[in-house]
């Protein structure tokens, strides 16, 4: 990708083609969906077991077992989401037919915890579908009762999975998802996440989720968030260094001004360096660079102390991009603008990626504005940054 202005320097940076990586995730979901449609539940279970045991992940760190399970229940969940959003009279078969069939499959495989897990996860998804985006005050009684019923059914099923698969990350993650859904003030939240992290310490996603759910708006407090971030750094120091602190705070400080204001920013920045030292791949480089350049700027101007922290983190984008970046990953930058919110619906992956590329190029041009204005070409190469006269 080359960008230039007349009589100015050029910005040259390769743009990664992430279609193959994205296709892998989509194909995994589709495989789970196909196996469920064909009633090949034994094979689905075997594949989920293998992926879970190997801690296999997609390029964005989503566990492969999660993708298979998502595909297997997607027809059921999407049918209910469509029925609830259609606006016409609700049909009980549309709302209950699919999950009843899943329950029947579970009863036909009573000794298979992975199939039970798929059913439990479907109930959690259906609970959220009924919950929607309404506030507690505006949630209709029917929606409230159905939401609670699905969460309760998931809570009934998960102990069987945990007893059969005590060392399974996907089962532990489901337990955390259930706690998040039930929204009960509970000391077990940090304990459940600690357990999940101990089962899969190389995956940052549970650490980030724990930080979010330890905010006061969920189950925790600012004090608990800081304590757990420090504890996580101590527990995972051999893998992440100070990065264990950074991952727990990563999404929390982007969401909450007070959490950001209270951050130990020097330790957070040390964690960024430790993460890149251990994960120097361009996926990670782009994610951390986009976070510092774009995500952390959201909410600027709402809290003076938080703004100071944000500016220090934002400045880190300079060295991350200059010292570590060799190629641009547009989808990562697009997600950064949404705060890496996985619930955001993407209608067109192409337009979403194009927006990410525009945001990234704007941020990088701004970073090198003096060099470009002076006629210097800025070129990113596999061996590092190269500056040359235009």
PLM region spans:
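Extreme N-terminal leader/anchor segments
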Residues: 1-97, 108, 321-390
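Short coil/linker segments at helix-helix boundaries
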Residues: 59-108, 122-160, 164-167, 171-198, ...
């Amino acid at each position: 990708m080359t960008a230039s202005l007349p009589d100015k320097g050029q910005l040259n940076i390769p743009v990664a083609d992430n279609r193959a990586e994205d296709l892998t995730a989509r194909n995994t979901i589709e495989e789970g969906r196909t196996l469920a449609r064909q009633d090949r539940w034994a094979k689905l279970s075997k594949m989920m077991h293998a992926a879970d045991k190997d801690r296999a992940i997609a390029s964005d760190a989503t566990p492969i077992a999660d993708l298979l399970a998502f595909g297997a229940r997607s027809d059921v969940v999407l049918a209910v989401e469509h029925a609830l959003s259609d606006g016409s009279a609700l049909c009980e078969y549309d709302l209950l037919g699919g999950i009843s069939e899943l329950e029947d499959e579970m009863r036909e495989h009573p000794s298979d915890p992975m199939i039970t897990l798929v059913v439990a996860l479907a109930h959690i998804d259906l609970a959220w579908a009924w919950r929607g985006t309404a506030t507690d005050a505006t949630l209709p009684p029917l929606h409230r009762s159905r939401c609670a019923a699905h969460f309760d059914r998931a809570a009934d099923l998960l102990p069987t999975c945990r007893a059969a698969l005590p060392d399974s990350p996907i089962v532990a993650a489901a337990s955390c998802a259930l706690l998040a859904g039930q929204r009960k003030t509970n000391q077990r939240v940090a304990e459940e996440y600690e357990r999940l992290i101990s089962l899969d310490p190389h995956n940052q996603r549970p650490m980030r989720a724990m930080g979010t759910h330890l905010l006061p708006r969920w189950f925790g407090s600012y004090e608990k968030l800081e304590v757990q971030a420090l504890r996580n750094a101590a527990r995972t120091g051999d893998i992440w260094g100070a990065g264990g602190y950074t991952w727990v705070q990563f999404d929390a400080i982007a969401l909450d001004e007070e959490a950001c204001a209270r951050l130990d920013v020097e330790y957070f920045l040390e964690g960024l360096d430790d993460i890149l030292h251990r994960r120097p791949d361009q996926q990670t480089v782009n994610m951390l660079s986009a976070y510092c350049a774009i995500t952390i700027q959201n909410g600027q101007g709402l809290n003076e102390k938080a703004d100071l922290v944000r500016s220090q983190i934002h400045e880190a984008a300079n060295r991350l991009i200059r010292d570590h970046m060799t190629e641009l990953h547009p989808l990562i930058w697009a997600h950064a603008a949404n705060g890496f919110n996985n619930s955001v619906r993407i209608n067109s992956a192409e337009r979403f990626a194009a927006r990410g590329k525009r945001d990234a190029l704007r941020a990088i041009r701004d970073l090198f504005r003096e060099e470009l204005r002076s006629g210097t070409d800025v070129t990113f190469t596999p061996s590092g940054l190269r500056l040359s006269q235009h």
